[in-house]
Amino acid sequence: DKNLATSATIQAAAIEGSQPASDLHRKREYRRDRHGDRVATVATATPLANSITEAYVMQRYLRPDLLEKAGITSFDGWAATFGSQVTEMEMGPAGGFRQKTRFARFQNVPEMLRMWHVAADVKTAEDLKLPVPEIAPRPSDGKREVETVVLQPTPELEDYISSIADRAEMVASRQVSSTEDNMLLISTDGRKAALDLRLVDEDSIQSGPVKLDAVASRILHHWEQTRGREYRDETGGTSPVRGSLQLVFSDLGTPNERRWDAYNELKVKLIQGGMPADAVRFIHEARDDNAKGRLFEAARSGHVAVLIGSTAKMGVGTNVQNRLVAMHHVDCPWRPA
């Protein structure tokens, strides 16, 4: 847990802190007082995920003595030593521009890396030579790069975005209390509306194609192209089950029995396009590791054509690449990394 309470003059760099992180820090400090500096071995695939402050937190966890020797007693001191702040104009959440000061770039990098590598043994994907398949050529230009699909907003979506801008102005001018409306709520509503207006208002009707229509169209296109493709089974022979697999990531609109959700809406569109209902599965069906293992086996063996899930549930440890031909990211994870 890298959420160790950290104060900073740059508001975006401060960490409020969590109980698990504080507990972990206290236990390490206790062991360090009793047994010396070498008290823990830590492994992580994301030493920096949400904020540059996490680099400072990791050094506090692992080698606070090096920070002390360098005369660094706070994040502000660390940032002044190894980074530079820049104040620039940037786009605000509701449109328009605002001044924002942020930790923009590193300085004294060799010195910082020397301190970092005393405790950290860093291995990149290139160092490990991890086998990663090539991205298929884009139909538009033949380049092996991610393809971004741009959709025009419907008039209804444009009207809603305008209302969000009005809400943001009211929050900024303190015409409403933070319990009534705030920028976090506004940002969340904007993300929901960008996926589908029905996530903010179930009765919304849009006059044109929406994002889920485009997603379904592309999934069905790949399915039609690869539904007859043959694959090898675990014995090396030809599998009797034909067809490929596609993964769909969406962190919003997850399955909900009590209200409209994007997952089931997408499934309906795929079924209407000719895909068998039992070929479309949700990662949320798997309630435990055993159920997840069975679902992944069905995906590897060709009994699942589309597996839909969130980053939290399907972003790590998803061993289903045998038949994988496409990944569709319907929305973006709400984190920098």
Label the model's feature ranges.
Residues 276-311:
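Conserved helicase ATPase core of P-loop NTP-dependent helicases/translocases
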Residues 252-282:
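Conserved helicase motor "Helicase C" RecA-like lobe of SF1/SF2 P-loop NTPases
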Residues 55-68, 324-329:
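A short helix-turn-beta junction within AAA+ P-loop NTPase domains corresponding to the substrate/partner-engaging
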Residues 2-17:
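A solvent-exposed, charged loop/short amphipathic helix patch at secondary-structure junctions
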Residues 175-183, 239-264:
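Conserved strand-helix element at the start of the C-terminal RecA-like helicase core
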Residues 13, 17-50, 61-205, 209, ...:
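Inter-lobe coupling linker of SF2 helicases/translocases
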Residues 1, 47-52, 293, 305-331, ...:
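SF2 helicase motor core recognition
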